[in-house]
């Protein structure tokens, strides 16, 4: 078997992983021993993730013409790819614990559903409530909206009526004040 079929098989494996993933984190694994990388793979598997060491060119070929093509700027130097789907928060914590213990890896970035993100961006995404909770909150907000609009519409005639009632009363007060002012001006002239 030549090199080309092996590379094509590796690209195919990477594409299958990408299809099943919603996030790919890219780390620099320079300086890690085989035992340390194996430990990271085991930890990632426990949280539904997959750790793969692959050549950047093969990952570039696997992501070409897909939503994952934004990973290209991260493909430099020795790269390990952490693929994940549902348990992003746990995967990120697992990686951060591993990085703190070994002090040998560097987080380059990640792609989440086709969007390139930094470590801070990934942490923000990981802190979001689950998709189901967000959908329930959105549905609740939509359900309340018509009620608020109806209450607002009902308030308009009331506010207009109050405003209309205030105009004559306000006008009467102004006219009364003008009458008193005129009387006060005429009294000093009459006294003089």
UniProtKB/Swiss-Prot annotation:
Q: Which InterPro entries match?
A: Ribosomal_uL10, Ribosomal_uL10-like_sf, Ribosomal_uL10_bac, Ribosomal_uL10_bac_type, Ribosomal_uL10_CS_bac
Keyword NAD part of the UniProt annotation: no
Q: Which UniProt keywords apply?
A: Ribonucleoprotein, Ribosomal protein, RNA-binding, rRNA-binding
Which one of the record's GO molecular function terms can you name? structural constituent of ribosome
Q: Does the keyword Translocase apply?
A: no
Family statement drawn from the similarity comment of this UniProt entry = Belongs to the universal ribosomal protein uL10 family.
- HAMAP family associated with the record: Ribosomal_uL10 (MF_00362)
Q: Which Gene Ontology cellular-component terms appear in the entry?
A: cytosolic large ribosomal subunit
GO BP annotations listed: translation
Assembly notes = Part of the ribosomal stalk of the 50S ribosomal subunit. The N-terminus interacts with L11 and the large rRNA to form the base of the stalk. The C-terminus forms an elongated spine to which L12 dimers bind in a sequential fashion forming a multimeric L10(L12)X complex.
Q: Which NCBIfam families match?
A: PRK00099.1-1
The top of its lineage is: Bacteria, Bacillati, Cyanobacteriota, Cyanophyceae, Gloeobacterales
Top-level division of the source organism's lineage: Bacteria
Q: What does this protein do?
A: Forms part of the ribosomal stalk, playing a central role in the interaction of the ribosome with GTP-bound translation factors.
What name does UniProt use for this protein?
Answer: Large ribosomal subunit protein uL10
């Amino acid at each position: 078997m030549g090199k080309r079929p092996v590379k094509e098989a590796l690209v195919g494996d990477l594409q299958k992983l990408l299809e099943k993933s919603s996030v790919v984190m890219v780390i620099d694994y320079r300086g890690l021993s085989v035992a340390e990388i194996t430990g990271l793979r085991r930890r990632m598997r426990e949280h539904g993730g997959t750790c793969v060491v692959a050549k950047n060119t093969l990952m570039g070929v696997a992501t070409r013409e897909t939503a994952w093509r934004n990973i290209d700027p991260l493909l430099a130097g020795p790269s390990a790819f952490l693929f994940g789907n549902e348990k992003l928060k746990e995967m990120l914590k697992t990686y951060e614990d591993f990085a703190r213990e070994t002090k040998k890896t560097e987080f380059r970035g990640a792609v989440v559903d086709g969007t390139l993100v930094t470590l801070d961006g990934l942490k923000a995404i990981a802190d979001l409530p689950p998709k189901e909770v967000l959908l329930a909150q959105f549905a609740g907000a939509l359900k309340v909206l018509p009620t608020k609009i109806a209450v607002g519409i009902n308030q308009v005639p009331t506010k207009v009526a109050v405003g209309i009632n205030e105009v004559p009363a306000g006008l009467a007060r102004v006219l009364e004040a003008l009458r008193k002012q005129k009387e006060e001006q005429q009294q000093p002239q009459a006294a003089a």
